[in-house]
Amino acid sequence: EIYHGERVALIGPNGTGKTHLLKVLSQEMAPTTGEVRFGPRTSVGVFTQINNRPDFLGRECISIVHDRISDTERAMKTLARYGLRNQARQKFETLSGGQKARLEILRLEIEGHNVLLLDEPTDNLDIESSEALEKALDGFEGTVVAVSHDRTFLAQFDRFIMITDAGEVYALPDFDVALRGLQLPQQLAS
């Protein structure tokens, strides 16, 4: 079970099914066993590193935010929280990959999603962009479930679920155990 406001990281080697699990949680794919249930007020938003947004081409950041936040001052504060205040008048296609990633997560938040599923959100981001994303997520009051291999990003999470090459799933007690990872069976048994 995952509760409102929790930060849950899905970790493990490449190819173990972490992204597949996100797709099941987003209801993009059906589970092969078990079931996924959400509370009645849950709204799930999904972030992937694919930034194909033809609907944003030719539009300024502030215009994209104005789709949901009509008050310009509030829209600018939201852009600032995501480190995008200086890009308010910049067209979407001129943004860096990191800026597009932050704008996409901002969009998910202002659309009213209270659960964010993030697939490698810091991949291909420079340090400054990654830090801006982390800061922005600190201000998000909903639940975040993320797949990541970024240790700095993972340090802000409350819970860790590790999926092994053998398909075993472990709930890890803390970040230090998550970093050690490979000694799991003995540590969790004690």
PLM features: residue spans?
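ABC ATP-binding cassette signature C-motif
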Residues: E1-S190
